[in-house]
């Protein structure tokens, strides 16, 4: 991908070239977007850029490995997160859904753009995965290829690292494209690439953790928000179309904010200039994003046309818009895994008393907060001095995000009217971070160039600059990168994974090939936990299984899947009779889903004659009882 803003001739986007002002905004009557600094360098990438980019990628890699303790092949082959028996952390359970998707996709069952069924889930049928839209099919498909290449757990680890590397690299290139100096672009890119947001969402929300397209949005927003807009069919127009289409292929939350701020910026410019071509260009960007969004939904929509709607598959209650709305104070709350025990303790204390919580990922980091406060200071100062045209565009963008997605904001009003898709407004904290970091790079680069005396600073000056850069990077790594797992925590994951793998192997050795296993407690899929059992915990044996079939995993809401819920209303003896009638060879029990650890159920099954020795996991939470009498 070439980000080179070559200056041979002015692009058709700009017909004249008035000088920019330092304050930002528009030069009065100019028709030229005003940069917060001089124009982009004559040659990009330069040797300094390549050295900085290579250093950036190495730094991000080492920081990521430090955060997860992945320093050898054995640790790379382990998941960085895995539910521990008896732990009802719903977010950590989501990683099992990720692993399930990658395994099924790697086996060829979940192909992009096609209807999706999984033969080994949803027994006695094939699991239907068509009613819940998968809006990130291309990233998921790439992840599945990584899982097939490196193994299920190692593949997702590689994907997580690539997400951080892409975020850092793209931000660096965008910052340099936006006239940022190499050093400031490096610092901001490191902060974005190691954002607490990405660490906290990976690996259980990998589609959310892929933040790398967001810096590209900043280019589009500036183009549409500044004169003369985007000239149709220019090089910039094609770049914007490509960015819009890329956004539509990724997480729908990011597609949403790209379209919102693109439309808002274009409408404001149209009100000032009445330039219909510029407005149409902005609408073309939104159309490109919409086209990709439609492509991602074709399988779901065509399945709906063929088999009717399933309103019960995807349920979004209004309460989550309140709970997971964007909250300004959460931008300042450190993560629970902060390297400072003092700050981590403060976060724990806050979460213990706060009535409304976020996804633990809104923290902007020290550098991000400094940039946010700087932007707020400049914007408020300009307003107080009645210099409204000097208020940075970025301040208005942040203001819109807060107005739209804060708890009780415009998004909540839409939710009250029935549109509850974007329930986690706190996820837009990463967009605020990207906006403020890039603004600080542009503004800081302007000041740096304005204060620079001569082109060849002396050794003392270079030493001061180098020390400042190193100090900033050390603060970022210390502040944003989570503390590494302890030996005890890693040993717990190893013990749980080994227990599940061995348990599944014993089931496959004891049951006929292709046998069906009925899972208790009865749970609906997706997003429906049971008391004591997180929503995707029943996927644990499937991750290590080769030929068994499991009752869990077909999407709820259709009559075909209702039989399990009806079964739960019968007596145990009647239920077992129905289970055997449908061809199941064993009953799998997660003991955590029963207040008495399912001991009465196991005792009753033995009394019914199913007295073959049960298969019990090493951790003691799983048991499998074959349904054949000795």
Describe these PLM feature segments.
Residues 1-78, 280-288, 377-395, 459-470:
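Start-transfer (signal-anchor) and selected internal transmembrane alpha helices
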Residues 61-167, 195-211, 324-325, 329-359, ...:
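Membrane-interface coil-to-helix junctions
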Residues 65-69, 108-110, 184-204, 292-305, ...:
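Membrane-interface helix-loop junctions at the exits of transmembrane helices
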Residues 159-178, 182-271, 285-289, 293-296, ...:
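Membrane-embedded helix bundles of polyisoprenyl
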Residues 272-283, 349-363, 372-403, 453-460:
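Membrane-interface helix-loop-helix junctions at transmembrane boundaries of multi-pass membrane enzymes
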Residues 471-630:
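Extracytoplasmic
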């Amino acid at each position: 991908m070439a980000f080179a803003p070559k200056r041979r001739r002015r692009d058709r986007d700009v017909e004249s070239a008035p000088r920019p002002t330092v304050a930002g905004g528009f030069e009065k009557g100019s028709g030229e977007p005003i940069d917060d600094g001089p124009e982009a360098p004559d040659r990009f990438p330069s040797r300094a850029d390549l050295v900085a980019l290579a250093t950036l990628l190495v730094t991000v890699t080492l920081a990521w490995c430090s955060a997860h303790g992945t320093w050898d092949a054995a640790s790379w082959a382990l998941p960085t997160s895995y539910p521990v028996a008896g732990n009802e952390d719903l977010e950590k359970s989501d990683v099992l859904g990720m692993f399930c998707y990658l395994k099924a996709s790697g086996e060829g069952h979940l192909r992009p753009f096609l209807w999706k069924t999984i033969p080994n889930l949803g027994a006695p049928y094939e699991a239907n995965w068509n009613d819940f839209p998968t809006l990130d099919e291309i990233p998921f498909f790439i992840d599945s290829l990584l899982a097939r290449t490196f193994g299920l757990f190692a593949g997702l680890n590689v994907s997580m690292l690539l997400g951080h590397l892409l975020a850092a690299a793209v931000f660096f290139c965008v910052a340099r494209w936006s006239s940022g100096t190499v050093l400031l672009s490096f610092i901001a890119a490191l902060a974005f690439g190691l954002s607490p947001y990405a660490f906290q969402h990976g690996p259980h929300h990998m589609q959310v953790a892929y933040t790398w397209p967001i810096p590209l949005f900043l280019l589009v927003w500036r183009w549409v928000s500044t004169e003369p807009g985007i000239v149709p069919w220019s090089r910039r127009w094609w770049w914007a179309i490509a960015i819009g289409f890329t956004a539509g292929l990724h997480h729908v939350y990011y597609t949403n904010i790209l379209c919102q701020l693109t439309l808002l910026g274009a409408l404001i410019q149209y009100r000032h200039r009445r330039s219909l071509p510029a407005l149409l260009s902005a609408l073309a960007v939104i159309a490109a994003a919409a086209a990709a969004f439609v492509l991602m939904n074709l399988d779901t929509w065509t399945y709906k046309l063929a088999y009717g709607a399933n309103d019960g598959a995807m349920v979004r209650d209004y309460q989550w818009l309140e709970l997971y709305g964007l909250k300004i104070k959460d931008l300042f709350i450190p993560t629970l895994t902060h390297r400072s025990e003092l700050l981590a303790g403060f976060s724990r204390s806050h979460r213990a008393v706060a009535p409304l919580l976020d996804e633990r990922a809104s923290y902007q980091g020290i550098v991000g907060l400094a940039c946010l406060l700087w932007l707020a200071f400049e914007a408020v100062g300009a307003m107080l001095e009645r210099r409204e045209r000097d208020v940075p565009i970025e301040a208005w963008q942040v203001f819109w995000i807060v107005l739209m997605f804060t708890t009780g904001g415009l998004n909540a009003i839409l939710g009250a009217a029935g549109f509850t898709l974007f329930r986690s407004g706190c996820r837009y904290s990463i967009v605020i971070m990207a906006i403020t970091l890039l603004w600080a790079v542009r503004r800081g680069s302007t000041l740096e160039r304005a204060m620079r005396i001569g082109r060849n600073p002396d050794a003392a000056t270079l030493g001061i600059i180098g020390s400042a850069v190193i100090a900033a990077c050390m603060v970022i790594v210390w502040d944003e990168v989570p503390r590494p797992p302890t030996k005890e925590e890693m040993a717990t994951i190893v013990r749980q994974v080994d227990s599940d793998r061995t348990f599944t192997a014993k089931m496959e050795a004891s049951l006929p090939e292709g046998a069906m296993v009925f899972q208790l407690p009865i749970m609906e899929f997706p997003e429906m936990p049971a008391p004591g059992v997180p929503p995707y915990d029943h996927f644990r044996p499937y991750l290590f299984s080769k030929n068994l079939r499991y009752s869990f995993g077909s999407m709820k809401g259709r009559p075909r899947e209702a039989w399990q819920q009806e079964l739960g209303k019968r007596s145990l003896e009647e239920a077992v009779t129905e289970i055997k009638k449908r061809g199941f060879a064993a009953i799998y029990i997660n003991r955590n889903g029963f207040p008495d650890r399912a001991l009465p159920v196991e005792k009753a099954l033995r009394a019914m004659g199913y007295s073959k020795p049960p298969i019990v996991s090493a951790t003691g939470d799983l048991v499998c009882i074959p349904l054949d009498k000795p």
